[in-house]
Amino acid sequence: MFDFAWSEIAVIGVVALVVIGPKDIPGAVRGVARMVRKARSMAAEFQGQMDQMMKEADLGDVRETFNDLRGVNLRQQLSRTLDPDGSMRSTFDNNPMAPSPAPMIMGGDEAHMVEERPFHSLSVMDESHMASEWTREKTVSSETARRAATAPAFIPPGEAFRSARRAPAFIPPADQG
């Protein structure tokens, strides 16, 4: 209870032997033991009464809270709070590795298809030529437009289009089997 070491108890015993004397030590030990027993029983009784008061006071509140929580759908409530328009969910649902249709060049009144080659097959010259062509002729593939439109609201539109045009950073190797 008080975390006494054996050496401290021995020092207390020696001091008691010297102060009280060997003749009165058994009576003093009985008195100390009686006081410790009484203190323990009072502490246990107090603890029991406090526990009973806590149970009586909180049980009704706990029941009401539990009944209120029983009908709550936490997943639905969190998704409604964090993503009210569903834009974050659609961002994570899109597959960036899915094949995209050929890009459309919006030049005059009509749109025509452009040949699409894998990113890793482009040379540096082709890449710079394509970049200048994209900015000059406003090339927008339907996949790029869709990815830019589904970008989260906090991303500016210009940045959304730039990041949607970029090829993915990781292209998995072809299956060898």
UniProtKB/Swiss-Prot annotation:
Gene Ontology CC, one term: TAT protein transport complex
Membrane association type: Single-pass membrane protein
Major localization listed first in the record, in broad terms: membrane
GO annotation, biological process: protein transport by the Tat complex
Location in the cell: Cell inner membrane
Keyword terms, alphabetized: Cell inner membrane, Cell membrane, Membrane, Protein transport, Translocation, Transmembrane, Transmembrane helix, Transport
Superkingdom as given in the UniProt entry: Bacteria
Record field: transmembrane: 1-21
InterPro entries tied to this protein: TatB
Annotated signal sequence range: none
Compositionally biased residues, Basic and acidic residues: 136-146
KW Iron-sulfur (keyword) present: no
Subunit architecture: The Tat system comprises two distinct complexes: a TatABC complex, containing multiple copies of TatA, TatB and TatC subunits, and a separate TatA complex, containing only TatA subunits. Substrates initially bind to the TatABC complex, which probably triggers association of the separate TatA complex to form the active translocon.
Function: Part of the twin-arginine translocation (Tat) system that transports large folded proteins containing a characteristic twin-arginine motif in their signal peptide across membranes. Together with TatC, TatB is part of a receptor directly interacting with Tat signal peptides. TatB may form an oligomeric binding site that transiently accommodates folded Tat precursor proteins before their translocation.
Full protein name: Sec-independent protein translocase protein TatB
UniProt organism field: Granulibacter bethesdensis (strain ATCC BAA-1260 / CGDNIH1)
Name of the encoding gene: tatB
